[in-house]
UniProtKB/Swiss-Prot annotation:
Induction: Up-regulated by nitrate. Up-regulated by nitrite. It comes from Chlamydomonas reinhardtii (Chlamydomonas smithii). It is a multi-pass membrane protein. Belongs to the major facilitator superfamily. Nitrate/nitrite porter (TC 2.A.1.8) family. Its main location: membrane. One of its GO terms (molecular function) is nitrite transmembrane transporter activity. The keyword Isomerase does not apply. The keyword Iron-sulfur does not apply. It is found in: Cell membrane. NCBIfam families: 2A0108. InterPro entries: MFS, MFS_trans_sf, NO3_transporter, NO3_transporter_NarK/NarU-like. The gene is NRT2.1. GO terms for biological process: nitrate assimilation; nitrate transmembrane transport; nitrite transport. GO terms for cellular component: plasma membrane; transporter complex. This is Nitrate transporter 2.1.
Length: 547
């Protein structure tokens, strides 16, 4: 017997209607913000945005603070060039596994606890920098401080949770870009802190040690603010509360989530190419001050101030990368996002080569470094205009894997060209290292041509006929999980993701089509004595159905 259609998600519709009164921006069907007003601190969307980038900013400051004071630390601990280079490799190696693990953590307990725990657990390592006595302790402490770079995953996951798919590239890029500024800010801030302590009467060999109490203390402060002010979900509640209430469906067993993320080849390609945008940025953050100090005979304060320019360009460069991604997606869809990434990152590789070729001129070096930083950092932002669409169910795992690719690229590149330990590195200058790093960047960006989404296509080929967003995202769920209603977030995301077809795509979006997994889930539900509508109505967000 047919029933009168009943509107599902009534509370969500009511919330969306009230959004203009409650928030200074509109919300989408998932409660995510359709706009990112960075000057506001509105709960929960904008407060999460600001807490995420501030925590990430501090992780960069602490990780690269030793590189900012490298000439001073090198002389005090009697470190060789190769030892200093290996310590730099250790700093970025720490976060490789940590970023993948953090992806699992945020998928399970939410970004707020993940961010706060990261800051509190690595703060002791920052303080311990004051106690190092030789290369082994110095490298060990840098390794453990570098673990905090997994904050990147919390930052991107949190923003991806709070902002609509049409602006998620911009929001992710702004937050990550402002966080990345810490890599430049530390080159400016740490020499000033060191000099201020030294001018206060503290000997130089002690002053650099005292300087590390500043970022260590700020670690604890930011973790406390995150716990007190942060909120995990657009609903205004934390993950654990939503799971207790049943409002936020569990993602099922952990292994299927990990399998979805690691088993998607697109994740690995983006991890590889991110290693030569963000990885290149990390490498430059590690070596630029020492390069300017030694190559041009500058004092530490001047070398630090000039080196800081590269990282401080993140104030707008990474954000513009995300904006470019969202802008080209409007007419060209996902294919436009991938093309833009390939073009920008290739240009970054070209200017990296040029940077190594102008090593005899300080003015030319600074100008080319600025241009190089623009393309390199825009490419970072462009990556996370694509990453959220690889997997809805395993978004945290994919973000962690791609982020880990950045650290892996930095570790490999620095070990090959800048560590000073291999035989060929004995006669290799840092300028030559920049040239070869640029060549690697150009070559290892080419795999982007192999990324293909069945519903959107690739850089050179179109979509598969009849492919729909619902099919792609629903394949991550089994029939039993669908019958349990665990897939609902993926279905809503699939509907929002139709915007990635681009306005030039002539396919009509039309009504939501029931994917194969959903039909199987309905049969499973019916076989267990339930009603088909318990799957269809809740999943499609449409009106009710009949028996």
């Amino acid at each position: 017997m047919a029933e009168k259609p009943a509107t599902v998600n009534a509370e969500l519709v009511k919330e969306m209607d009230a959004a203009p009164k409650k928030y200074p921006y509109s919300l989408d069907s998932e409660g995510k913000a359709n706009y990112c007003p960075v000057w506001r601190f509105t709960q929960p969307h904008m407060m999460a945005f600001h807490l995420s980038w501030i925590c990430f900013f501090m992780s960069f400051v602490a990780t690269f603070a030793p590189a900012s004071l490298a000439p001073i630390i090198r002389d005090d601990l009697f470190l060789t060039k190769s030892q200093l280079g290996n310590a730099g490799v250790a700093a970025v190696c720490g976060a490789i596994a940590a970023r993948i693990f953090m992806g699992i953590v945020v998928d399970s307990i939410g970004p707020r606890y993940g961010a706060a725990a990261t800051m509190l657990m690595t703060a002791p390592a920052v303080f311990c920098m004051a106690l190092v006595t030789d290369f082994s302790t110095f490298a060990c402490v840098r390794f453990f401080i570098g673990l905090s770079l997994c904050m990147f995953v919390c930052c991107q996951f949190w923003c991806g949770t709070m902002f609509n798919v049409k602006i998620v590239g911009t929001a992710n890029a702004i937050a990550a870009g402002w966080g990345n500024m810490g890599g430049g800010a530390c080159h400016f801030i740490m020499p000033l802190i060191y000099q201020g302590i030294k001018d206060g009467g503290v000997p130089g060999y002690q002053a650099w040690r005292w300087a590390f109490f500043v970022p260590g203390g700020i670690y604890i402060l930011t973790a406390t603010l995150t716990l007190l002010l942060g909120i995990d979900h657009p609903s205004g509640k934390d993950y654990r509360d939503l799971k207790k209430e049943g409002t936020l469906k569990a993602k099922g067993a952990m292994w299927p989530v990990v399998k979805c993320g690691l088993g998607n080849y697109r994740s690995w390609i983006l991890a590889l190419t991110y290693g030569y945008s963000f990885g290149v940025e990390l490498t430059v953050d590690n070596v630029i001050v020492e390069y300017l100090f030694d190559q041009f005979g500058l004092n530490l304060a001047v070398a630090g101030a000039l080196g800081a320019i590269f990282g401080l360009m993140n104030l707008f460069t990474r954000a513009t990368g995300g904006m470019i991604s969202d802008l080209v997606a409007k007419p060209f869809g996902m294919r436009g996002r991938i093309w833009a990434l390939w073009i920008i990152q290739t240009l970054g590789g070209i200017f990296c080569i040029v940077l190594g070729k102008v090593s005899n001129s300080l003015s030319s070096t600074i100008v080319i470094m600025i241009v190089f930083s623009i393309f390199c950092q825009q490419a970072c932002g462009l990556h996370f205009g694509i990453t959220p669409f690889v997997s809805r169910r395993a978004y945290g795992v994919v973000s962690g894997l791609v982020g880990a690719g950045g650290n892996t690229g930095a570790a490999i590149t620095q070990a090959i060209w800048f560590a000073g330990t291999a035989p060929w590195q004995l006669t290799l200058s840092k300028a030559d290292g920049f040239v070869y790093m640029g060549i690697m960047t150009i070559g290892l960006t080419l795999p982007l041509f192999f990324i293909w989404f069945p519903m959107w296509g690739s850089m050179l080929t179109g979509p598969r006929e009849g492919a729909e967003e619902e099919d792609y995202y629903m394949r991550e769920w089994s029939a039993e999980e669908v019958a349990s209603g665990l897939h609902q977030g993926s279905m809503r995301f699939a509907m929002e993701s139709k915007s990635q077809r681009g306005t030039r795509d002539k396919r009509a979006a039309g009504p939501a089509r029931v994917p194969q997994q959903l039909r199987l889930g309905a049969r499973c539900c019916q076989a267990r004595g339930g009603l088909i509508r318990c799957v269809l109505a809740q999943s499609l967000g449409a009106t009710g159905c009949s028996d």
